């Protein structure tokens, strides 16, 4: 049986990148906007300010845990489907989608229950006890955000699956709809009703609910890989292969959570020893500042990951169809595009940090806030070009079916280097050591990624063409 995706093996690479990467970038940017928009409105509410910002920073890694599970299932299914379609095995692709839906629903319910039961312990683990006001806001925000976890996970998991069905445009639209609603509701709930952190969270959950509802509608109207009733029965081999293919996406996100937990706790520990930030009224500033730096980084990485993840169906199809020359061409163009994005971001953080900070309510804050924020942007993101190239390498290896290499590289970056430097450098440089942990991690990771890039080119050059 021929699938309608055969054009993936014949269309110009540049055109395919535009078709698949641009909607994926927009989808990821829009998805990132949920938390970023919350933080912008929270920061500009005078009754929340840096305390609300710090609370958002505490809760953010916990939403990434949900995202990690969702993208493991969704990206794994996307890769499975793309390879299956390249081999003309459509029934297997449909079964993968059905199994992915069930795995997502079960895991989201379990995670929601765990969050509700162990909320206080979890918040303390991620630095929520920096001061009493921050902890109060963290509790409120986390409770309502947790109620939306099933909707959030389902929408995020379905996004790459919808792209694999050959409809990247709808994947973009259904995510955009939820985020647009969130942007509309945030100022109403935060400034109009003065619901504070609860208002920001409720606006987010409503947006996620709309996205999930649209994803369900599309699932029932898929073009190529709509599951039949029997496809929803879990099959061990398909679940295992899906999770294996998506493991890099999971570890990339979950290891980032480990790094953020280490960073948050080092900020809490060494901020308390600082002459300024050791004072109760300023204790939340380092946590809030690192949070806004990470939000800017999230925007950049959404573009980078969107480019690479959008190419997964193209890579998977051409690998399955034994067309290595096209895969090599795609890899080259992707690396150049990712490096360009990183270069633009570097110019912004080095030359215009004040403008970036102003988005997050600096007018309502002390000079200590602004000074530390400028320094944080310039140090923490000084190697952002390498970070972009590293991310592209992680995802491309995953798309080629090299799950072991991709997973290992991702783990080394976030856990060995990320957590390691976050714990080590503050011992010698205090609070500044936390800021230097990211560029150091990116430099060492790039040395390994460079080797894998060269190795991948050699392998693609020696593969036979069909």
Regions found by a protein language model. Give the residues of each.
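Small-residue hotspots at the loop-to-helix junctions and early N-terminal turns
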Residues: 50-61, 138, 142, 201, ...
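Small-residue-rich hydrophobic transmembrane alpha-helices
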Residues: 53-113, 152-171, 287-347, 351-353, ...
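Transmembrane helical elements of multi-pass membrane transporters/channels
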Residues: 19-38, 144, 178, 207-211, ...
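Short alpha-helical transmembrane segments in multi-pass integral membrane proteins
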Residues: 1-21, 81-148, 192-247, 315-383, ...
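Helix-terminus/linker motif at the lipid-water interface of multi-pass membrane proteins
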Residues: 29, 33-54, 123-132, 188-195, ...
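Short runs within selected transmembrane alpha-helices of multi-pass transporters and secretion channels
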Residues: 27, 144-163, 171-179, 200-213, ...
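N-terminal transmembrane alpha-helices
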Residues: 9-48, 61-76, 80, 105-112, ...
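Residue-level hotspots within pore-lining transmembrane alpha-helices
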Residues: 26, 30, 34-37, 66-70, ...
């Amino acid at each position: 049986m021929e699938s309608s995706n055969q054009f993936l093996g014949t269309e110009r690479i540049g055109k395919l990148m535009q078709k698949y990467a641009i909607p994926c970038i927009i989808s990821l940017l829009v998805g990132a906007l949920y938390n970023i928009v919350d933080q912008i409105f929270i920061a500009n509410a005078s009754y929340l300010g840096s305390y609300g910002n710090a609370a958002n920073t505490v809760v953010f890694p916990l939403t990434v845990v949900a995202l990690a599970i969702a993208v493991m299932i969704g990206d794994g299914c996307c890769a499975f489907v793309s390879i299956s379609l390249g081999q003309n095995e459509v029934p297997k692709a449909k079964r993968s989608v059905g199994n992915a839906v069930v795995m997502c629903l079960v895991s989201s319910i379990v995670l929601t229950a765990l969050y509700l039961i162990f909320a206080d312990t979890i918040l303390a683990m991620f630095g929520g006890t920096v001061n009493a006001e921050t902890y109060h806001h963290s509790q409120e925000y986390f409770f309502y955000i947790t109620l939306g976890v099933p909707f959030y996970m389902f929408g995020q998991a379905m996004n790459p699956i919808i792209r694999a069905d050959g409809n990247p445009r709808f994947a973009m639209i259904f995510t955009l709809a939820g985020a647009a609603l969130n942007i509309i509701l945030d100022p109403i709930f935060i400034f109009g009703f003065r619901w504070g952190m609860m208002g920001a969270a409720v606006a987010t959950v409503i947006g996620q609910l709309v996205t999930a509802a649209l994803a369900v509608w599309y699932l029932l109207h898929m073009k190529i890989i709509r599951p039949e009733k029997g496809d929803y029965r879990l099959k061990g081999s398909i679940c295992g292969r899906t999770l294996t293919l998506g493991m890099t996406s999971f570890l990339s996100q979950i290891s980032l959570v480990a790094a953020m937990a280490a960073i948050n706790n080092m900020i809490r520990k060494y901020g308390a020893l600082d002459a300024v930030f050791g004072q109760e009224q300023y204790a939340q500033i380092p946590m809030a500042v690192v949070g806004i730096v990470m939000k800017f980084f999230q925007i950049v990485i959404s573009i980078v990951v969107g480019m690479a993840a959008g190419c997964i169906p193209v890579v998977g199809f051409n690998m399955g169809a034994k067309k290595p020359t096209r895969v090599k061409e795609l890899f080259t163009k992707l690396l150049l595009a990712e490096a360009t994005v990183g270069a633009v971001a570097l110019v912004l953080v080095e030359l215009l940090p004040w403008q970036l900070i102003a988005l997050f309510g600096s007018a309502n804050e002390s000079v200590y806030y602004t000074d530390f924020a400028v320094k944080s942007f310039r140090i923490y993101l000084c190697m952002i070009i390498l970070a972009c190239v590293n991310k592209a390498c992680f995802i491309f290896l995953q798309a080629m079916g090299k799950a072991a290499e991709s997973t290992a590289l991702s783990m080394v970056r976030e856990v060995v280097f990320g957590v390691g430097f976050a714990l080590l450098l503050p011992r010698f440089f205090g609070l500044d050591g936390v800021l230097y942990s990211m560029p150091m991690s990116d430099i060492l990771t790039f040395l390994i990624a460079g080797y894998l890039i060269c190795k991948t080119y050699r392998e693609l050059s020696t593969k036979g063409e069909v």
